[in-house]
From Swiss-Prot:
Annotated GO MF terms: anaphase-promoting complex binding; ATP binding; ubiquitin conjugating enzyme activity; ubiquitin-protein transferase activity
UniProt region (Disordered), positions on chain: 156-222
Keyword list, A-Z: Acetylation, ATP-binding, Cell cycle, Cell division, Nucleotide-binding, Phosphoprotein, Transferase, Ubl conjugation, Ubl conjugation pathway
Pfam families: UQ_con (PF00179)
Function: Accepts ubiquitin from the E1 complex and catalyzes its covalent attachment to other proteins. Catalyzes 'Lys-11'-linked polyubiquitination. Acts as an essential factor of the anaphase promoting complex/cyclosome (APC/C), a cell cycle-regulated ubiquitin ligase that controls progression through mitosis. Acts by specifically elongating 'Lys-11'-linked polyubiquitin chains initiated by the E2 enzyme UBE2C/UBCH10 on APC/C substrates, enhancing the degradation of APC/C substrates by the proteasome and promoting mitotic exit.
Gene designation per UniProt: UBE2S
EC number annotated for this UniProt entry: 2.3.2.23
Name of the protein in its database record: Ubiquitin-conjugating enzyme E2 S
Subunit structure: Component of the APC/C complex, composed of at least 14 distinct subunits that assemble into a complex of at least 19 chains with a combined molecular mass of around 1.2 MDa. Within this complex, directly interacts with ANAPC2 and ANAPC4. Interacts with CDC20, FZR1/CDH1 and VHL.
Length: 222
């Protein structure tokens, strides 16, 4: 089994162990950390889909990999649960600034996990790894939300507490989670959440501007 533990200086290993122990005992809201006893540089994590988003009700498995240059270099983040999101690539790679140019050694693992959870609330289509998801987010939010919600139901265990419990058991056993109840979660995760309202407002503004322009053109022709 490949591991970067042997490549890290002893004082870095102690710092990582301390933070991981703290995160395990006192994790951020909606996040759980499952340390890999065989490899401290491979952190297994679950993130609950935030309310008011198409990911609500889902439980998403991910991992953080700490490289040999950590913390001088940022960790790499991957979703293990399939997800339809502009900033998540086909292989699960997560694209967020804190894992790239905004990284500093002082940020720590907790900050990274909180930033990734925030990415589920506020996707960034301008740095999309999934171009289709990024395009739909900007042009057709309802379709984007429907696609994201469908994958959440199928892969994210979005069947209420029973589905989330199964996803948690799958993480502990190292197997892929599956939904026990693929029924639509509806509610705030649907097309009426804050993300939908934000994009609906942007579309309304664009539509109003277009109508105004068309009206001016029509008047010029008179």
């Amino acid at each position: 089994m490949n591991s970067n533990v042997e490549n890290l200086p002893p004082h870095i290993i102690r710092l990582v162990y301390k933070e991981v122990t703290t995160l395990t005992a006192d994790p951020p809201d909606g996040i759980k950390v499952f340390p890999n006893e065989e490899d401290l540089t491979d952190l297994q994590v679950t993130i609950e889909g935030p309310e008011g988003t198409p990911y609500a009700g889902g439980l998403f498995r991910m991992k953080l990999l700490l490289g040999k240059d950590f913390p001088a270099s940022p960790p790499k983040g991957y979703f293990l649960t399939k997800i339809f999101h502009p900033n998540v690539g086909a292989n699960g790679e997560i694209c967020v600034n804190v894992l790239k140019r905004d990284w500093t050694a002082e940020l720590g693992i907790r900050h990274v996990l909180l930033t990734i959870k925030c990415l589920l609330i506020h996707p960034n289509p301008e740095s999309a790894l999934n171009e289709e998801a990024g395009r739909l987010l900007l042009e057709n939010y309802e379709e984007y939300a429907a696609r994201a919600r469908l994958l959440t139901e199928i892969h994210g265990g979005a069947g209420g507490p029973s589905g989330r419990a199964e996803a948690g058991r799958a993480l502990a056993s190292g197997t892929e989670a599956s939904s026990t109840d693929p029924g639509a979660p509806g509610g705030p995760g649907g097309a009426e959440g804050p993300m939908a309202k934000k994009h609906a407002g942007e579309r309304d503004k664009k539509l109003a501007a277009k109508k105004k322009t068309d009206k001016k053109r029509a008047l010029r022709r008179l």
